[in-house]
């Protein structure tokens, strides 16, 4: 399979400052993109699953002309919307598909492990079975442990798990942690109507920073990876906390609250800057919230951040975020108490959609921004203009 982006498929831009479109790919007509990560000349894209597709692999040796090399369908009744790649391995989650009425039949629940001897043609070497509803998100930057959120048997909702990948052909659970009350035989202690559930953990030194839905930020001590324990927790109005990105050199973290409700006028979900320099975290400021989108249909609000993985563009000053119908937003945290928006990019709605739904993004080491649309827009490749490129160079960690 080979499919190359063409000028005829290039979308028009609704609004932009600091970023411009370099290329677009419709992912072979399966445009429901989710997590995206670049490693060398290979780009890995997970799919939300509404199209039935699971994973796409593209050759991006020429970023202006990505070529679709391989696609795998999602297993029945499941989706595989998250991808991580490092140390010659590709990890792909398997989870019960949540976006349509339940159907009979088995669910694929766990984590697939692929070798990347040929980065464009992965070969599966293992599957770790989680049971239950499966693995929602995995974070892995290489090394022994992969960090996952999953709902295994016997739990009400997603908890935090670690898998030991020291033998990639035989992954094994190394540890798990959950908020008291999540296990089915425990009594929940959080307010009625709230949800306490792990989304994912980002690791900095001996600390894991978890977005934990209505529990907000949860910080765990992982100095012994096999015995995690709670250090601190911070919540705020709104909930639905998704990502907590540590900026360890500055004692900060950036948190997104995921918009999970269609508009118009859904609850506000935004981006916050947190002080995590001590064991009592605090909210410092909110990032500017885009105007003019609240009355639109579908999702408007924060979702994913570029997560500063090794091998990517890394900054403790510039934050890249997806905002669904408000596109990509770039914030400057030079003064963390007064974050400023310094760039944005938004395409016209893809065919058949009332608005864009930009979903996830990855900023590569060269400064290109790879972005997906969750419904049908596929993949966008953005490049910074000279002003933003200079700022990115100055702000690089």
What name fits each language-model region?
Residues 1-397:
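Feature marking well-ordered beta-strand scaffolds used for ligand recognition
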């Amino acid at each position: 399979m080979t499919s190359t982006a063409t000028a005829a498929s290039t979308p028009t831009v609704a609004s932009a400052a600091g970023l411009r479109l370099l290329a677009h790919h419709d992912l072979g007509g399966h445009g429901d993109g989710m997590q995206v990560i670049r490693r060398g000349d290979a780009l890995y894209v997970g799919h939300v699953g509404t199209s039935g597709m699971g994973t796409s692999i593209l050759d991006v040796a020429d970023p202006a002309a990505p070529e679709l090399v391989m696609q795998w369908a999602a297993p029945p009744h499941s989706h595989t919307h998250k991808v991580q790649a490092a140390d010659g391995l590709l990890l792909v989650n398997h989870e019960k598909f949540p976006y349509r009425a339940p159907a009979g039949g088995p669910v694929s629940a766990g984590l697939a492990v692929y070798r990347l001897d040929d980065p464009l043609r992965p070969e599966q070497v293992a599957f770790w079975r989680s049971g239950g509803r499966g693995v929602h998100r995995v974070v892995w930057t290489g090394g022994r442990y992969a960090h996952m959120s999953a709902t295994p048997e016997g739990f009400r909702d997603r908890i935090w798990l670690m898998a030991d990948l020291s033998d990639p052909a035989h992954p094994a659970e190394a540890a798990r942690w959950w908020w008291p009350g999540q296990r089915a035989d425990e009594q929940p202690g959080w307010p009625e109507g709230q949800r306490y559930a792990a989304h994912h953990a980002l690791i900095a030194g001996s600390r894991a920073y978890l977005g934990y839905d209505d529990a907000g930020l949860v910080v765990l001590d992982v100095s012994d990876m096999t015995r995690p324990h709670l250090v601190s927790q911070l919540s705020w109005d709104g909930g639905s906390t998704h990502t907590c990105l540590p900026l360890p050199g500055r004692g900060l973290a950036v948190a997104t609250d995921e918009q999970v409700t269609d508009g118009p006028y859904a609850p506000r979900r935004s981006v916050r800057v947190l002080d995590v320099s001590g064991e009592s975290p605090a909210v410092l400021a909110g990032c500017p919230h885009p105007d003019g989108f609240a009355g639109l249909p579908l999702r408007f609000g924060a979702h994913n951040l570029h997560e500063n993985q090794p091998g990517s563009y890394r900054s403790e000053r510039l934050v890249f975020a997806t905002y669904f119908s408000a596109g990509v937003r770039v914030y400057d945290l030079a003064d963390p108490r007064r974050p400023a928006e310094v760039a944005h990019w938004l395409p016209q709605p893809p065919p058949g959609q009332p608005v864009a739904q930009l979903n996830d993004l990855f900023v590569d080491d060269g400064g290109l921004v790879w972005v997906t649309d969750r419904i049908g827009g596929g993949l966008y490749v953005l490049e910074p203009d000279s002003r933003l490129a200079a700022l990115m160079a100055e702000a690089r960690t």
